[in-house]
Amino acid sequence: MQNRIEITEANLRNDRLVLTSEINDGAERKPAGRMLTDSDHFAFVYILEQDESFEYVILNEGIWSDLKAALDAGLPVFLHIGNTELELNGFHDELGYLIENIKDNANYGEEMEERVKRIFL
C-alpha cells in the first residue's frame, strides 16, 4: 500500500483522540470518511484524499486500545499532521462497521478476527 501515513502516537484527551504522524510536508489533505482493513498487517486504514490521489492512515494494533476508548466514549478522532489537525469524519461509523463485519468472519483471516475480538469485543 503506497502513500502510507504511519501513526507514531495516539493521545486521548478530554474531548478527543489525537493521532500523530511525523509527516510535515504541508500538503493539503481531506478526510474521505472511509476506512478499510489491512488484515496482513493487522491494521485499520483511514483514507484521506490528496489532490487526485489517496493516502492511507495506518492504524496499527498498538493503538487499538486508544481507538476503542474513543469509540466507547464517542470522542471525535483527529489526525495531527504537520501544523494541521483534521477531524477524521465518519470514523466511528466506519470502524464500528468493520468491527462488526470482522466478527465471526473468516474472510479477514483467523488471526485478524481474534485480535479484533480481543480488543474491541
From Swiss-Prot:
It holds the Pfam family UPF0738. InterPro entries: UPF0738. It comes from the Bacteria. Belongs to the UPF0738 family. This is UPF0738 protein BLi01253/BL05110.
